[in-house]
Amino acid sequence: MSDFSQNNAILSLRWLLGLLIFSLCMLQLCLTYRGLDNETAMDMAQVARQIARGEGFTTKFIRPIDVWDFSQKAKKSPKEETLDFDHFAEANHAPVYPYILAAAIKMTGYDDFAAKRMDTEKSNIYEGDRVISSVSTIFFLLAMVLAYSLVARMFDEVVAITTVAFMGISELMLQYAISGLPQPFMLCLVLAALHCLISAIQAYQLDKTRNVLLWLGLCFIFMSVLCLTCYMCIWCFAGLLIFCGFYFRPNGMYAAIGVGVMLMLVALPAALYLTPTGGVERKFIYGIFNGFGSDGAETLMRTASPTSIAFNSSNFFLRLLGYTFSQFNNMYVNMGAIFTVPFFLLALFNRFKKPSIQGIKWAVLAMWLCACMGMALFGEAKAISESQLAILFTPCFAAFGTAMVFICLSRMQLGESFNAIRALTVLGMLIISSGMFLFQLPKQLYIGIWTSARGIPHFPPYYPAAMNGKLHDMSKAEEIIVTDQPWAVAWYADRKALWMPRSLSDYTRNLETIFNEQGQKVQGFLITPTSHTMTGSGIAGVIRKAGDFAPLALEGKLLLLTPKHNMAFAELFSTNANPKSTARPLASLVSSQGMYRHRNFILGAEMIYYSREDVSEFNK
């Protein structure tokens, strides 16, 4: 094949691949879309709406631990600090991505809740979700362009097309594209930083010191923005600094510059931002519970007495090492189940001719190893999570793996049949990597076409129409709803929501006291399928998750057995199981004689709102 014909073929493949990936994204966003299903995405969305309204970096999702932290801070300096539940400072998310979402929300008018309320008679999908998913989809498409240019720059266009094809039809990558999470944006930043790093390595090989400083400076800036998008990415930055310290001479000089950039652009803003809730050190300790606490960070976030939760420090470093190696074990799945990803480890033993490829290989390895340690210490085991960093290394791992497969084929002396065998190999790898997704795609399209008029939400546990409609009408903006789904209440109902604590005494003795001191009223309790959906662990899992409020969570399941909904399970809990407890019993809160005695079935027995006042007129 002549060079002209080969260039035309590559150009055609490039356009076909771009059209395929764009079409898949649009199908997800327009035809088979079911709304957001990630609590962090909803939380960031409601914070972004607050920003778009001019309320600053505030939240309507209130965590008990933050109430305790803010109250302790206010007690120490009552003249300087006040606990304002109407403008409750957000201290759990890095600031960059919510501001990007805020721009999208402002441009589309979704900062005005009343003007953009759902028409529950026509749709089950909140269009605000589609706005949030559109932002992540745009960044996903941009990441594909950056990945293509980076891989083509390192190897050639055939490897680039193959790598992007792997990513574009990976089910996990496409799920991230509509997840509303910041990972697609973070992927863009990582790829931009690696572009700068390649230029710095090339300049270093030519002894152009000024250019090395320029490109590394840009690389460090991109990494700083990455850290301000997700604090976990500081581990990636640390890996990059380690690489720079050993690769560039004089050793340590460029790494020291990177440390200075990180301190100025990341550490200082983070310290100022986290000061209201006890500072960076407190958030650091809280974060460790996500990996090493008894039940993860959720248990800690749902308590207003953090001193009562013990941190298991036994065999700390041994467990850290074990959790780190578990990240290696899950590498294939967490990087989209792409066939060539594991071959990156084989590429470590191959010496590439270009110094830039060699340098990037070790830089990516250093960043990934540090990220694995960070995910073991602070992260989660879920494949789709705001703290999952493995996805950021997928393009490089897949590219090096693909290159190694092609190198192995070239060494087999296939002669004129090389291109045909390479094409068949790529096709086979694509089928293996995306077979399940492609197999399910026709069914998803069929369901999407037949349900496109109203849509199917991610129920259980989420049902936006119930919150955007009835719950919003039943509740008041100035009062708080205690719920097991506060991120959804804050986003869909536009109401202040307290994450329901696991301990009854935590609520009645600590939180109620703080609310009374601040003149903040609680208007009711909302129980959703988040608490009572039976998973593999059954009732034991419900009890473990809901804690002392388990009877309230299980009441919905019991009510499903009684057609007239006349059973009140909480009535049985008029005394505490522990005779020494000074907490008020559960029945004093939610029963026929309790403070929140009015039971409202927002979505049958699946979603029950226990209100202080009679709001039955809105439940029609």
Language-model regions: role of each:
Residues L11-L20, V212-I221, A238-I242, G260-A267, ...:
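Signature aromatic-anchored transmembrane alpha helix within multi-pass, membrane-resident enzymes
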Residues Y176-A177, Q183-L187, L226, W235, ...:
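Hydrophobic/aromatic-rich transmembrane helices and adjacent perimembrane loops
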Residues R153, Y204-V212, F248-V259, L345-W368, ...:
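Membrane-interface helix-loop-helix junctions at transmembrane boundaries of multi-pass membrane enzymes
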Residues M154, A193-L216, L226:
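Membrane-interface transmembrane helices that cradle and orient dolichyl/undecaprenyl
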